[in-house]
Amino acid sequence: MDARDIILRPVITEKSTNLMDDKKYTFDVLLTATKTQVRNAVEEIFDVKVKSVNIMNVRGKDKRVGRYTGKTARRRKAIVALTDDSNDIKIFQENTEDNK
């Protein structure tokens, strides 16, 4: 399995952006991904050293539109902590004059 198939997207919330100051990054990952697979994928894609990986399963929420009910998709979230000597991961694009 390719590393880019395991890491789906970064999670951008207030809590996850506060964790970035401590070199902890949050990603949505494949539902079947293990900690070892997430560690190897992050190290390969971003060229960093991973200290630890914490994974949690987030259940889908019940949603209603009128009388119809449904569920949002469940997901798997990984919080990846980098070593102190590792480079930061650039999730946001730098704002330059050409990027307006």
UniProtKB/Swiss-Prot annotation:
Gene from which this protein is expressed: rplW
Protein name: Large ribosomal subunit protein uL23
Pfam families (alphabetical): Ribosomal_L23
Family as reported in the entry's similarity comment: Belongs to the universal ribosomal protein uL23 family.
Record note on quaternary structure: Part of the 50S ribosomal subunit. Contacts protein L29, and trigger factor when it is bound to the ribosome.
NCBIfam families linked: PRK05738.2-4
Entry keyword Ribosomal protein: yes
UniProt keywords, alphabetically: Ribonucleoprotein, Ribosomal protein, RNA-binding, rRNA-binding
Single GO BP term: translation
InterPro entries for the chain: Nucleotide-bd_a/b_plait_sf, Ribosomal_uL23-like, Ribosomal_uL23/eL15/eS24_sf
Entry keyword rRNA-binding: yes
Gene3D superfamilies assigned to the protein according to its UniProt record, in alphabetical order: 3.30.70.330
PANTHER family assigned: 60S RIBOSOMAL PROTEIN L23A (PTHR11620)
GO CC terms of this entry: ribonucleoprotein complex; ribosome
Function: One of the early assembly proteins it binds 23S rRNA. One of the proteins that surrounds the polypeptide exit tunnel on the outside of the ribosome. Forms the main docking site for trigger factor binding to the ribosome.
Molecular-function GO terms, alphabetical: rRNA binding; structural constituent of ribosome
